[in-house]
Amino acid sequence: MYAVIRTGGKQYRVAQGDRVKIEKLAGDVGGKVNFDVLLVGGEGEAKVGTPTLAGVTVEGEIVAQDKHKKVIHFRKKKEGWTKKRGHRQPYTEVLITTVRA
Protein backbone atom coordinates (compact mmCIF):
# COMPACT_ATOMS: atom_id res chain seq x y z
CA MET A 1 0.00 0.00 0.00
CA TYR A 2 1.25 3.48 -0.82
CA ALA A 3 0.12 7.02 -0.06
CA VAL A 4 0.73 10.50 -1.41
CA ILE A 5 1.41 12.95 1.41
CA ARG A 6 1.72 16.73 1.49
CA THR A 7 4.37 18.53 3.53
CA GLY A 8 6.44 21.65 3.00
CA GLY A 9 4.44 22.65 -0.08
CA LYS A 10 5.43 19.45 -1.91
CA GLN A 11 3.89 16.03 -2.46
CA TYR A 12 5.67 12.71 -1.90
CA ARG A 13 4.71 9.13 -2.77
CA VAL A 14 5.56 6.96 0.25
CA ALA A 15 5.10 3.42 1.51
CA GLN A 16 5.82 1.79 4.85
CA GLY A 17 9.57 1.54 5.47
CA ASP A 18 10.54 4.38 3.07
CA ARG A 19 13.05 7.05 4.09
CA VAL A 20 12.22 10.48 2.66
CA LYS A 21 14.12 13.78 2.75
CA ILE A 22 11.59 16.57 3.18
CA GLU A 23 11.68 20.29 3.98
CA LYS A 24 12.79 21.01 7.55
CA LEU A 25 10.28 20.12 10.26
CA ALA A 26 10.40 21.22 13.88
CA GLY A 27 11.25 18.31 16.15
CA ASP A 28 14.07 16.24 17.53
CA VAL A 29 15.60 13.03 16.23
CA GLY A 30 13.38 10.14 17.34
CA GLY A 31 10.24 12.30 17.38
CA LYS A 32 6.98 11.29 15.71
CA VAL A 33 5.26 13.20 12.89
CA ASN A 34 1.90 12.87 11.10
CA PHE A 35 1.19 13.92 7.52
CA ASP A 36 -1.83 15.04 5.46
CA VAL A 37 -2.81 12.21 3.09
CA LEU A 38 -3.99 13.20 -0.39
CA LEU A 39 -4.25 9.76 -2.02
CA VAL A 40 -4.06 6.09 -0.99
CA GLY A 41 -3.57 3.21 -3.40
CA GLY A 42 -2.32 -0.31 -3.63
CA GLU A 43 -4.95 -3.02 -3.66
CA GLY A 44 -7.74 -2.26 -6.10
CA GLU A 45 -8.81 1.29 -6.80
CA ALA A 46 -7.06 4.35 -5.40
CA LYS A 47 -8.88 6.70 -3.01
CA VAL A 48 -8.43 10.40 -3.71
CA GLY A 49 -9.17 13.09 -1.12
CA THR A 50 -10.76 16.49 -1.64
CA PRO A 51 -8.17 17.78 -0.67
CA THR A 52 -7.30 15.27 2.09
CA LEU A 53 -8.64 11.89 3.15
CA ALA A 54 -10.38 11.60 6.52
CA GLY A 55 -9.54 8.54 8.60
CA VAL A 56 -6.28 7.82 6.76
CA THR A 57 -3.03 8.41 8.60
CA VAL A 58 0.64 8.28 7.68
CA GLU A 59 3.03 8.34 10.61
CA GLY A 60 6.78 8.76 10.54
CA GLU A 61 9.80 8.99 12.80
CA ILE A 62 12.44 11.71 12.45
CA VAL A 63 15.74 10.01 11.65
CA ALA A 64 17.99 13.03 10.98
CA GLN A 65 18.06 16.83 10.83
CA ASP A 66 20.75 17.90 8.35
CA LYS A 67 21.61 20.19 5.42
CA HIS A 68 21.90 19.40 1.70
CA LYS A 69 25.07 20.00 -0.30
CA LYS A 70 25.90 23.66 -0.88
CA VAL A 71 24.14 25.32 -3.83
CA ILE A 72 26.18 28.09 -5.47
CA HIS A 73 24.51 30.89 -7.44
CA PHE A 74 26.99 32.84 -9.59
CA ARG A 75 26.18 35.90 -11.72
CA LYS A 76 28.56 37.70 -14.05
CA LYS A 77 27.97 40.78 -16.18
CA LYS A 78 29.93 41.93 -19.23
CA GLU A 79 31.67 44.76 -17.36
CA GLY A 80 33.54 42.47 -14.96
CA TRP A 81 30.99 42.62 -12.13
CA THR A 82 30.44 39.29 -10.37
CA LYS A 83 28.29 38.10 -7.52
CA LYS A 84 28.61 34.71 -5.84
CA ARG A 85 26.18 33.50 -3.20
CA GLY A 86 25.53 30.09 -1.75
CA HIS A 87 23.41 28.35 0.83
CA ARG A 88 22.75 24.91 2.28
CA GLN A 89 19.07 24.04 2.47
CA PRO A 90 18.09 22.30 5.73
CA TYR A 91 16.06 19.09 5.53
CA THR A 92 14.53 16.46 7.76
CA GLU A 93 14.91 12.76 6.99
CA VAL A 94 11.83 10.78 7.99
CA LEU A 95 11.27 7.01 8.20
CA ILE A 96 7.65 6.15 7.33
CA THR A 97 6.49 3.76 10.06
CA THR A 98 2.80 3.20 9.27
CA VAL A 99 0.27 3.82 6.50
CA ARG A 100 -3.26 3.20 7.81
CA ALA A 101 -6.26 3.33 5.49
Swiss-Prot record:
GO terms for molecular function: rRNA binding; structural constituent of ribosome. It holds the Pfam family Ribosomal_L21p. InterPro entries: bL21-like, bL21-like_sf, Ribosomal_bL21. Signal peptide: none annotated. One of its GO terms (biological process) is translation. Keywords: Ribonucleoprotein, Ribosomal protein, RNA-binding, rRNA-binding. GO terms for cellular component: cytoplasm; ribonucleoprotein complex; ribosome. It comes from the Bacteria. Belongs to the bacterial ribosomal protein bL21 family. Part of the 50S ribosomal subunit. Contacts protein L20. PANTHER family: 50S RIBOSOMAL PROTEIN L21 (PTHR21349), LARGE RIBOSOMAL SUBUNIT PROTEIN BL21M (PTHR21349:SF0). This protein binds to 23S rRNA in the presence of protein L20. This is Large ribosomal subunit protein bL21. The gene is rplU.
